[in-house]
């Protein structure tokens, strides 16, 4: 269903939301950030911390073939961080349920759990210098641009996935996230790993490790604080044979914008072509711990061997965090514009989170 006739009308909600938030107390993005490396608190003895989260809930289409059918998004993740002096490390895993029908087909809405999919997604060690520079070697890692995948997106869940390389295996990552000027760079050789070589395997529905097949690449970003609470970001990814990604954005406590262009991917790794897109997002803390958010996303896909396509949608979300940050409840919605290709279904999302 396409409710709004033009992107310009959709954008009207954003300055309205921002105008109210600018006058209130400083708010923070309605999301948890677990991408930062462990803080060094002790230099005399090793320390360990186990942490993670559980999400129970999922998605529902509002029309189309799967209208009012529930798609489960329940997941669990957790890991152990280690610190000793300037040395640190992390091993972290994740997994989620897979809905399956009676014929054994996976990811079928409105069916019960048929299996589980998961694996280790972060396994690295590193050293932090006195000036805050971190040097990490990994067997599993998030790329630098993956750390910024939701940067500038205040909505809880249904935001757009920018086409950068995300989860990687053997890699070198160097970053310094302190001060007004921050940077992060990651380099990795080509990945040839798939589920047949998985460290963990949870049955016939588990295809988790297939994502570790990718071309050699290097990506990274720089961030600079133009003023207090105003950050400018620029990112770049260079790949072996699948083009380059250029990314830029601006972030304030309540408003953000980002734009990107990929020269070699039209719709993910397997579709050659190009993609250009932009997103604007805003957030307002209506009550203590209650964040209202909205966003508009537009992307143009130009495949080499198919017709051009357009992604265009508006989001409205609510994030409620309570219990000293131990619990959160999230609602998100996505409504497609009339200029979106293929008449995709509008969608809603509801999830309860538990953190430890």
From Swiss-Prot:
Q: Which residues are the signal sequence here? A: 1-21
Q: Which domain of life is it from?
A: Bacteria
Q: Which UniProt keywords apply?
A: Signal
**What's the name of the protein?**
Uncharacterized protein YgjJ
- Origin organism is Escherichia coli (strain K12)
């Amino acid at each position: 269903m396409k409710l709004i006739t033009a992107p310009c009308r959709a954008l009207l909600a954003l300055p309205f939301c921002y105008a109210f938030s600018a006058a209130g107390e400083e708010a923070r993005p309605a999301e948890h950030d677990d991408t930062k490396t462990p803080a060094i608190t002790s230099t005399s003895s090793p320390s360990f911390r186990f942490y993670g989260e559980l999400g129970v809930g999922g998605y529902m289409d509002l029309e189309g073939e799967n209208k009012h059918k529930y798609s489960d998004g329940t997941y669990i993740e957790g890991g152990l961080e280690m610190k000793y002096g300037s040395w640190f490390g992390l091993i972290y895993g994740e997994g989620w349920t897979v809905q399956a029908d009676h014929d054994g087909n996976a990811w079928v809405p409105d069916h019960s759990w048929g299996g589980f999919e998961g694996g280790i997604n972060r396994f690295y060690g590193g050293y932090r210098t006195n000036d805050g520079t971190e040097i990490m070697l990994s067997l599993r890692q998030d790329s630098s641009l993956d750390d910024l995948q939701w940067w500038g997106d205040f909505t809880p869940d249904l935001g757009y996935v920018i086409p950068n390389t995300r989860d990687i295996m053997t890699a070198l990552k160097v970053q310094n996230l302190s001060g007004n000027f921050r940077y992060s760079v990651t380099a990795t050789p080509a990945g040839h790993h798939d589920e047949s070589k998985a460290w963990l395997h949870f049955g016939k529905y588990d295809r988790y490790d297939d994502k570790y097949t990718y071309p050699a690449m290097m990506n990274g970003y720089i961030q600079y604080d133009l003023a207090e609470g105003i950050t400018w970001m620029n990112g770049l990814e260079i790949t072996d044979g699948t083009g380059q990604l250029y990314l830029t954005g601006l972030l304030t406590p309540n408003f953000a914008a980002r734009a990107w262009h990929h020269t070699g991917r039209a719709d993910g790794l397997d579709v050659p072509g190009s993609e250009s897109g932009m997103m604007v997002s805003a957030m307002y803390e209506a009550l203590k711990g209650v964040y209202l958010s909205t966003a508009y996303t537009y992307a143009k896909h130009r495949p080499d061997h198919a017709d051009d396509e357009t992604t265009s949608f508006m989001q409205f979300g609510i994030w409620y965090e309570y219990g000293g940050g131990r619990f959160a409840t999230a609602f998100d919605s996505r409504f497609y514009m009339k200029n979106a290709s293929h008449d995709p279904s509008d969608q809603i999302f509801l999830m309860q989170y538990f953190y430890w």
